[in-house]
Amino acid sequence: NEIQKVGGPHQNPESPARHMKRIQEITYELKTGQGWTLAEGSQSRFYVQKNGEFTTGGKFTPAPVYLMFIYYYNAKGELMNNQFVENGQDNIHQHFFTPENVRPTFDGQAEADDNDARTLVDYLYVDTTPWNKTKHGKEAEITGSGNPIGLKGVIRFLKDRKEFDLKIRLYHGYKSKTNPETGTFDPFYKPSGILIQRGTWDINLSIPVVVFWNRDEYVDVEEDTN
């Protein structure tokens, strides 16, 4: 919807306390013999707030929504996102985001539909062309709906008092990332079986997420983003 294309506040907390920072980073590194591991000094999980549904001027304006950017670096520390976009690579790469191992927080309750990804998260691909420019800077257009990659996205969380692992997978199609049976792109949370058969995973890791609060609860937001 429109609010997701525009974006929203980065209300990401640093700790379980009611104290939030606007920007939160989690870093993983690939270690020989160990696979993807949490980098030393990195936060281990995201603490987020449940989305509230509002309307402004007759338009659906949910808040908060979270901008989520993914950056890949090579062993030299050089940004390598372009390798998944340029020279036709954008036609065979797509990130998928699937909540797993869903459970209530200490003050929450299990619900019958907790294992339905659509009740937990909503994600919109907001990749841009060029890939390394922004619409905010008027240097790029949002093209994620017609060519989803997932290096840039908007995510909102639909239930509070939940913990889960957000499985992030980067699909690499042998020839295409389009579902051959439907002629469309698979939804962000569920790559189809036939798509999986026709490609491989470049990235497959999970990030813990805790949805502590809902939109009506008071939370301090710290301006310092360091």
Language-model features, listed with the residues they occupy:
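N-terminal edge beta-strand
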Residues: 18-61
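Beta-strand-rich structural segments
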Residues: 68-75
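Short beta-strand elements
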Residues: 22, 181-226
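Residue-level recognition of well-ordered beta-strand positions that form the cores
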Residues: 29, 71, 169-171, 210
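Exposed beta-sheet edge/beta-hairpin loop segments within beta-rich domains
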Residues: 56-66, 84, 131-184, 188, ...
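Extended, polar beta-sheet/loop recognition surfaces of beta-rich domains
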Residues: 78-136
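Bacterial Sec-dependent N-terminal signal peptides
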Residues: 1-10, 226
